[in-house]
UniProtKB/Swiss-Prot annotation:
Gene3D superfamilies reported in the protein's UniProt record: EF-hand (1.10.238.10)
Induction statement: By touch.
Organism in which the protein naturally occurs: Arabidopsis thaliana
Summary of the function given for this chain in its UniProt record: Probable calcium sensor that binds calcium in vitro. Involved in the regulation of trichome branching.
Protein name listed in UniProt: Calcium-binding protein CML42
UniProt note: phenotype after gene disruption: Trichomes with increased branch number.
Length: 191
């Protein structure tokens, strides 16, 4: 039993960027992910759409395993997961892998929370900094946006404008401090 708990903690530490600890950010990000995965915009994510999205992210999942996991969350009569089903699946996965770590709020005054937040930001930065040089170039940003299936990745001019909007020192690329500043100043609409 102790070994199982240690394994969960180890997985949680290695994959801390998966955990979405702030409830308002969690809901916003989860809705955005749902919208990205719902390719035809019908309000449902089919097993096939989920499989395609995971493949684009480099997470090749066995279709039969995915089907057996996901189908139990699909309501009778629906063609796929609606947002509530998707949220339930996410919560179950979070509880299974991370002990429900995404449900709680963040305490900015807590030094360990601040360190985790910094670590999460560093992991997110590495996703975009594909060559590991410490900067996000327009080409790297475009590559990631395309992998995610986002239309913004289709036009380099649009990607360059995104870079310019956060590039405070005007060197044509985003460093980690500019990335952190951008992530911390994202405005989340209140409901």
């Amino acid at each position: 039993m102790e070994s199982n708990n240690n394994e969960k903690k180890k997985v949680a530490r290695q994959s801390s960027s998966f955990r979405l600890r702030s409830p308002s950010l969690n809901a916003l990000r989860l809705q955005r992910i749902f919208d990205l995965f719902d390719k035809n915009g019908d309000g449902f994510i089919t097993v096939e759409e989920l499989s395609q999205a995971l493949t684009r992210l480099g997470l090749n999942a066995d279709l039969s395993d995915l089907k057996s996991t996901v189908e139990s969350y699909i309501q009778p009569g629906n063609t796929g997961l609606n947002f509530d089903d998707f949220s339930s699946l996410h919560k179950t996965l979070d509880d299974s892998f991370f002990g429900g770590a995404c449900g709680g709020g963040e305490n900015e005054d807590d030094p360990s929370s601040a360190a985790e937040n910094e670590s999460d930001l560093a992991e997110a930065f590495k996703v975009f900094d594909e060559n590991g040089d410490g900067f996000i170039s327009a080409r790297e940003l475009q590559t990631v946006l395309k992998k995610l299936g986002l239309p913004e990745g289709g036009e380099m001019e649009r990607v360059e404008k995104m870079i310019v909007s956060v590039d405070r020192n005007q060197d044509g690329r985003v460093d980690f401090f500019e990335f952190k500043n951008m992530m911390r100043t994202v405005v989340i609409p209140s409901s």
